[in-house]
From Swiss-Prot:
It is an enzyme of class 3 (hydrolase). It comes from Arabidopsis thaliana. Glycans are attached at residues 234, 254, 318. Transmembrane segments: none annotated. This is GDSL esterase/lipase At3g53100.
């Protein structure tokens, strides 16, 4: 009997903590899936070459501490969490921080170099979307044991689920994979990715998720690494890559509408980051930037992950005027602007 009383008190305490943790926030939880745009450190302890838990990554983050974020500071989803009223960030699910009541504000399952296409993650030792979904199921079981089935159902249905993927599928797979190039046009490959996307949303829906936001592809042809690898010596944005991004994003928006019509109660928003990001690149001074082609880290042409390190020659002293932190990822300053766009476009996920 005494054991039952202690157990019952612990459940009551955790339920109270659940409501306390989300009291200042407008939604009970934030749950993230996808790639390096939203990864906050899940790759840190993997046998993967794609990591960022070392300086100069994180040099402008809290306590100048590298966490595994592919940025000099905060990601767009970090700013989004702040805007939504969270006092801390949902932890990386594979980190030590993802313990006890910390996961009651959500969790982050994203893994750098993953994509809609599971094979994209294999060469890099990253966590595929399929595996991220299995971790999410384990997360749901843990939360349900902690706060009870009814409260857990509220958390999953009212919490916002964010998905960011697709860039790695194109830049780190399709464009450099001769077999995929031979078998599929960019349009056909986009259809393959969107079938995986639809299946992923279907699975989330069956697991109780009702508020989901998916981040579009950025102007891929304007990433410094893309210009270096695919620009044929030209220093301008690679037009064909940007055209592929536009094509994919159009299909993504159409697919989200079809999925919403098919699933009762589903709120699904396709966040358009392409145009806001392109506006920053094409009108830098209007947004407080002066460098759009060269990234801050190293030579600014290709460095990312282990190539962007404390010994990288040429790393800028102050990244606030740079659009790109490394060859693939924006600076904290850009992430803050993009987070405002996400918030504005995602009102339907909040109300």
């Amino acid at each position: 009997m005494q054991k039952m009383r202690v157990s019952g008190f612990r459940v009551l305490l955790l339920v109270s903590c659940f409501f306390c943790k989300s009291k200042g926030a407008v939604v009970p939880a934030l749950i993230m899936f996808g790639d390096s745009i939203v990864d906050v450190g899940n790759n840190n302890n993997l046998l993967s070459i794609v990591k960022s838990n070392f300086l100069p990554y994180g040099r402008d983050f809290i306590d100048q501490r590298p966490t595994g974020r592919f940025c000099n500071g905060k990601l767009a989803v970090d700013f989004s969490a702040e805007y939504l009223g969270f006092s801390s960030y949902p932890p990386a699910f594979l980190s030590r921080e993802a313990s006890n009541e910390n996961i009651l504000i959500g969790a982050n399952f994203a893994s750098a170099s993953s994509g809609y296409y599971d094979a994209t993650s294999v060469p890099f030792g990253s966590i595929s979307l399929t595996r991220q979904l299995s971790y999410y199921r384990a997360y749901q079981n843990r939360v349900t044991r902690m706060i009870g089935r009814g409260n857990a159902r509220i958390l999953f249905s009212r919490g916002i689920h964010i998905l960011s993927a697709g860039s790695s599928d194109f830049l780190q797979n399709y464009y450099i994979n001769p077999l995929l190039n031979i078998l599929n046009t960019p349009d056909q490959f986009a259809d393959i990715l969107l079938r995986s996307f639809s299946e992923f949303i279907q699975n989330l829906y069956e697991l109780g998720a009702r508020r989901i936001g998916v981040i579009s592809l950025p102007p891929m042809g304007c990433l410094p690494a893309a210009i270096t690898l695919f620009g044929a010596g030209n220093k301008s944005c690679v037009e064909r890559l940007n055209n592929d991004a536009i094509m994919f994003n159009t299909k993504l928006e159409n697919t989200t509408r079809l999925l919403m019509n098919r699933h009762s109660g589903l709120r699904l928003v396709a966040f358009n980051v392409y145009q806001p990001f392109l506006d920053i690149i094409t009108n830098p001074t209007d947004n407080g930037f002066f460098e759009t082609k060269r990234a801050c880290c190293g030579t600014g042409t290709i460095e990312t992950s282990f190539l962007c390190n404390s010994l990288s020659f040429g790393t800028c002293v102050n990244a606030t005027g740079y659009v790109f932190w490394d060859g693939f990822h924006p600076t904290e300053a850009v992430n803050e602007l993009l987070a405002g766009q996400l918030l504005g476009q995602g009102i339907s996920l909040i109300n």
